[in-house]
Curated annotation (Swiss-Prot):
GO terms for MF: acetylcholine receptor inhibitor activity; ion channel regulator activity; toxin activity
One Pfam family linked to the record: Toxin_cobra-type
Main location: secreted
Keywords: Acetylcholine receptor inhibiting toxin, Disulfide bond, Ion channel impairing toxin, Neurotoxin, Postsynaptic neurotoxin, Secreted, Toxin
Protein's organism: Naja naja (Indian cobra)
Function (record text): Binds with high affinity to muscular (alpha-1/CHRNA1) and neuronal (alpha-7/CHRNA7) nicotinic acetylcholine receptor (nAChR) and inhibits acetylcholine from binding to the receptor, thereby impairing neuromuscular and neuronal transmission.
Tissue-by-tissue expression: Expressed by the venom gland.
Subcellular location: Secreted
Gene Ontology cellular component list: extracellular region
Stated name of the protein: Long neurotoxin 1
Length: 71
């Protein structure tokens, strides 16, 4: 499977059986810059704490960098 990986946001091969993920959360600059984003691959969908959103998928390049809605 191929997943986008941060910080370069490039598509890279991940080991067989892994899933791609997009993890987003707010930090101190969330109102100005939007949510922080972490893209990667893992053996299983990571468990996250409250306030962190995660989406996992299992097809090539299914985790593109999320677009931010403009006001």
């Amino acid at each position: 499977i191929r997943c986008f990986i941060t910080p370069d946001i490039t598509s890279k091969d991940c080991p067989n059986g892994h899933v791609c993920y997009t993890k987003t959360w707010c930090d101190g600059f969330c109102s100005i810059r939007g949510k922080r984003v972490d893209l990667g691959c893992a053996a299983t969908c990571p468990t996250v704490r409250t306030g962190v959103d995660i989406q996992c998928c299992s097809t090539d390049d299914c985790d593109p960098f999320p677009t931010r809605k403009r006001p």
